[in-house]
Swiss-Prot record:
It is found in: Cytoplasm. The active site is at residue 144. Belongs to the acetokinase family. PROSITE patterns: ACETATE_KINASE_1. Mg(2+) binds at residues 8, 375. Substrate binds at residue 88. Catalyzes the formation of acetyl phosphate from acetate and ATP. Can also catalyze the reverse reaction. Pfam families: Acetate_kinase (PF00871). This is Acetate kinase. The gene is ackA. It comes from Mycoplasmoides gallisepticum (strain R(low / passage 15 / clone 2)). The record marks 176, 235 as: Transition state stabilizer. Transmembrane segments: none annotated. HAMAP family: Acetate_kinase. Mg(2+). Can also accept Mn(2+).
Amino acid sequence: MNKILVINAGSSSIKFQLYDANEKVLAKGLCERIFIDGAFKYEFEDGSKDEGNSAFPTHKEALTHLLESLKKHKVINDLSEIVGVGHRVVQGAYWTDSTLITPQVLEKIYELAKLAPLHNKPEADVIDVVQKLIPKAKNVAVFDTSFHTSMPEVAYEYAIPREWKEKHLVRRYGYHGTSYRYVTKRFEQLLNKKAVNLVICHLGNGASIAAIKDSKSINTSMGFTPLEGLVMGTRSGDIDPSVVQYIAKQTNKTLDQVIDDLNKKSGLLGLSSYADMRDVTSNLPKTQLTLDVYTQRVADYILKYANQINASIDGLVFTAGVGENASLIIQEVVNKVHLLKVSLDPKAFEQKYSDYRKLSDDKSQLNVYQVRTNEEIMIMRDVVRLSK
């Protein structure tokens, strides 16, 4: 049976899922610490696992290792069974949809690495390796930014010198688009509507919010890079740009080093010394300020986007790692959203759920939901759609 491989490559890691034609997950896992000492962890449909350490000098060795493991565990007999490979690509600039990868497309992904150096280059490197290891498979690029190309100019323009945009492509792009696309499609099904209006909070280690009107993105909190917007695990979110120059002068750090600090040493970590929301919530009350700063930022964006939708809102939706699991965070956020008169049902949080659940009560003027996102299945479906 034909199989589809979904790959999410980072600067030093590769996450993957392997699907059959019926959207069943046959295997999943990751290779990490590429370029360092190498580690892998794989899970298979039959419940077996394979994990340990292995030298991964580059992404090529990591990919070769995971493909050999699929054969060793009889998930596939030959690489030719993998007929399509979907690649998550963070920066797609003006691509409005996922696309089959041609030499010209791959060249453009490399070129766009100047906008997303931490992401696009390793993603393009992995695409290049996959094309050589599985030459007959069709490769599809699925861009984080594509879903947000529907944003109007008023949402994506920065008030900056025109030359910055025209020559250097500086504008707001938005990210987590594949997750927002999945949640939007899911709500069209759940509510039996052709188009929906939603405020979606994608709260994970990376976090953002999107305003969805008529099933299209009209605004989102991440901007030119994923650094803008909400407080995140290690990212600062919104900050006065002058801070970068000031800290560089005060500490003799380069601009790159200061930006690196805003990406890797800020957010929850900077406020509390904990990058994981589970650690923040388990160390209350000493981390209360961190919780308040985080949830206030989320609440402020919810109100901002509800205003921009300017129509009946079908739901306020929480998704991703924190949004799907941290009930306290949802309660704290809703407590700070005063103007919308949202009311939660305490008993709803006690119910287990597989895919989604409604959290608001009958008195609430806005329905609140938790939904488990599934970016991988969207990538898999794009591969099937574009490979026909």
